[in-house]
């Protein structure tokens, strides 16, 4: 009986230590974040707001770029869902100074301050590269394939714990998959917009694996100050709201002008 109790106690202790070790290991692993940036390169969007966009982008990156955060830049054009439509900026942590000597608390605090300064400079350098990539000139596209990007985005999210999305576009879909400009009104009602989104989402699902956008924390859309088709914005947002909802995104899309 004593032997049974002894082995039972040892087993519980081992399980407890294993659980603690697992918990420490999991806690020590930092979350990986992704910022997805998209810019409309179609002919329907002029470049008059470039300066304001750049100012807004810098503010956005300063607020949300942090350690263990990668950034991907995508163009919105006729090849939006292409695998090559992604310019990556991976976060590389600066090296820490390793010393075997015992350090005072003050020295440890100083070392940490110096390390944080390195992180800040790393992020600043990356932000400049991202802004440059977003403003890079490309050939103007006659198509605006927007909804198609949910497929590559879903694939990207598999390697991350969370993500945010920022889109600079009038978001007027104009491609072979779906064209908002064929009729007098892009979406005559919100219910119509939702129904079309449901059909389009099913069509997108058939093109690849299951679309999962649940890791996205928030989505921001920045439209031109003076869009050419203001009437589209009455019901069109409901279309994209439904697309993202069906993709398991639990938040809302924040629409704004510069």
Task: Set out the residue ranges of the language-model regions.
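Bacterial signal peptide processing site
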Residues: 21-23
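Extended amphipathic alpha-helical interaction segments
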Residues: 134-196
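Acidic/histidine-rich, surface-exposed loop or edge segments in extracytoplasmic proteins
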Residues: 31-45, 129-135, 219-224
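Von Willebrand factor
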Residues: 31-160, 163-167
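Positively charged n-region of N-terminal signal peptides that target proteins for export
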Residues: 1-4
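C-terminal motif of bacterial Sec signal peptides marking the signal peptidase cleavage site
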Residues: 16-19
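VWA/integrin I-like adhesion module and closely mimicked acidic/polar interface patches used
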Residues: 172-228
């Amino acid at each position: 009986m004593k032997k049974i109790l002894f082995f039972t106690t040892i087993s519980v202790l081992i399980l407890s230590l294993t659980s603690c070790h697992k918990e420490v290991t999991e806690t020590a692993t930092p979350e990986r974040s992704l910022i997805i940036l998209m810019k409309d390169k179609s002919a329907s969007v002029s470049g008059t707001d470039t300066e304001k966009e750049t100012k807004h982008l810098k503010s956005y990156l300063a607020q949300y770029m942090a350690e263990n955060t990668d950034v991907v830049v995508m163009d919105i054009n006729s090849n939006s869902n292409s695998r090559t439509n992604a310019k990556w900026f991976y976060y590389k942590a600066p090296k820490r100074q390793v010393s075997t000597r015992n350090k005072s608390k003050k020295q440890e605090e100083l070392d940490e301050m110096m390390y944080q300064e390195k992180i800040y400079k790393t992020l600043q350098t990356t932000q400049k590269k991202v802004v440059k990539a977003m403003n890079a000139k490309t050939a103007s596209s006659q198509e605006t394939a927007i909804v198609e990007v949910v497929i590559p985005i879903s694939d990207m999210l598999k390697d991350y714990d969370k993500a945010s999305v920022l889109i600079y576009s009038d978001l007027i879909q104009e491609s072979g998959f779906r064209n908002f400009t064929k009729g007098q009104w892009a979406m005559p009602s919100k219910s119509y917009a939702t129904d079309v989104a449901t059909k389009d989402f099913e069509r997108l699902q058939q093109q690849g694996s299951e679309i999962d956008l649940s890791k996205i924390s928030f989505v921001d859309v920045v439209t031109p100050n003076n869009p050419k088709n203001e009437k589209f914005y009455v019901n069109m947002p409901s279309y994209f709201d439904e697309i993202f909802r069906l993709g398991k995104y639990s938040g809302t899309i924040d629409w704004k002008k510069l």
